[in-house]
Design a protein with these regions (language model features):
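P-loop/Walker A NTP-binding region and its immediately flanking N-terminal helices
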Residues: 1-172, 176-178
Length: 178
């Protein structure tokens, strides 16, 4: 049996299971219920506060075939594929190791394609503050005029390293220490 980190094994799969971030989960659920989901989010907070987990839950919730009170059902075809990592419409990128202009340009090309199964293509860019200046400039063009079927969730521990032009195009959520 392979080793699985505890944070992966016991990662919350609904907003309700997320601990200590009710001010954020309530807002996100209300946006989903009202069908008023933004095109770009910035999740900011220290390590282990739930940024990436919230991004994954949000990506599933907005694509879920049978959402319940703003939560993903985690039972439909889309949710199951997303949980297993098989859904190509939810793309996770670690900007610490994929921080070049070329990496972002490939995203810019991909956003023109419609999702294959889900309603939205969701790009989760973790440690976004690690992008190069050129990569930020390339990302900015997509954030300014994103296609209807694309959502971005940027996660960072250091928002002060992000250009003001990126910050101004995202809904910012500050995660509290738990």
């Amino acid at each position: 049996m392979g080793y699985t980190a505890l944070y992966r094994k016991f990662r919350p799969i609904t907003f309700t299971e997320l601990v200590g971030q009710e001010h954020i989960t309530r807002t996100l659920r209300n946006q989903i219920i009202a069908n008023r989901v933004g095109h770009a989010y910035l999740f900011n907070g220290g390590r282990g506060t739930g940024k990436t987990t919230s991004a994954k839950v949000l990506a599933r919730a907005i694509n879920c075939l049978t959402p319940n009170d703003g939560e993903p059902c985690n039972e439909c075809e889309i949710c199951k594929a997303a949980i297993s990592g098989a859904l190509t419409d939810i793309v996770e990128m670690d900007a610490a190791s994929n921080n070049s202009v070329e990496d972002i340009r490939s995203i810019r090309e991909e956003v023109n394609f419609l999702p294959t199964k889900a309603k939205y293509r969701v790009y989760i860019i973790d440690e976004v503050h690690m992008l190069s200046q050129g990569a930020f400039n390339a990302l900015l063009k997509t954030l300014e005029e994103p296609p209807e079927h694309v959502k971005f969730i940027l996660a960072t521990t250091e928002p002060q390293k992000l250009p003001a032009t990126i910050l101004s195009r995202c809904q910012r959520f500050d995660f509290k220490r738990i």
